[in-house]
Design a protein with these regions (language model features):
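Single-stranded RNA-binding regions, centering on S1/OB-family and related RNA-binding modules
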Residues: 1-178
Length: 178
């Protein structure tokens, strides 16, 4: 949707812009017009983008064919670019962990896909599901998940995911000698 930040990989660079593939959307391509590559005048587009490069772009509009998007590179701040890339990397990592789990517990492709979709819907992101399980192991069963995959899921989460915040309780004494 318009204004969304998406992950794109440059497929082809032309004089007037760059064609990109969208990792998260199968069958939809993007185009970054030369005027949306960078602020200011772009003399050589290849100095800014090259094939195979991963970019974070802002969706400007959906073209009439509904199969391609017009994107902007210049309207994404460095901070937002970094945050979105970190989010994408975390999600890729979570997919890898779920692959490990699927193999471990013997899920079929259909089960694997179904759990991936369900967990993503329940926790907004797949990474969010792992993060929540690492922080609060009972979070999965509390919202109705059950099965022999829960414990290995929690173990993978605890081993591989570092939560944003950790609560530490205890007594702390500090002596200062003058």
């Amino acid at each position: 949707s318009e204004g969304e930040l998406i992950v794109a990989v440059v497929r082809e660079v032309k004089q007037n812009g760059a064609y990109v593939d969208l990792d998260e959307y199968e069958g939809i391509e993007g185009f970054i017009f030369i005027g949306e590559i960078a602020s200011g005048w772009v003399k050589n587009i290849r100095a800014f983008v090259r094939p195979g490069q991963r970019l974070i772009c802002k969706v400007m509009r959906t073209r009439k064919d509904n199969k391609s998007l017009e994107l902007s590179l210049k309207s994404v701040s460095e901070e937002r670019r970094r945050d979105r890339l970190a989010q994408w990397k975390n999600e890729e990592r979570a997919k890898q962990l779920l692959n490990v789990l699927a193999e471990q517990v013997g899920w079929t492709k259909e089960e694997h896909l179904e759990y991936q979709t369900d967990l993503t819907e329940s926790f907004l992101t797949l990474y969010g599901a792992f993060e929540e399980a690492a922080k609060t192991p009972e979070s999965l069963t509390e919202i109705g998940y059950e099965g022999d995959w829960i414990q290995p899921f929690i173990e993978l989460a605890v081993k591989n995911i570092i939560p944003d915040t950790v609560e530490i309780r205890g007594r702390f004494t500090l002596n200062v000698d003058q």
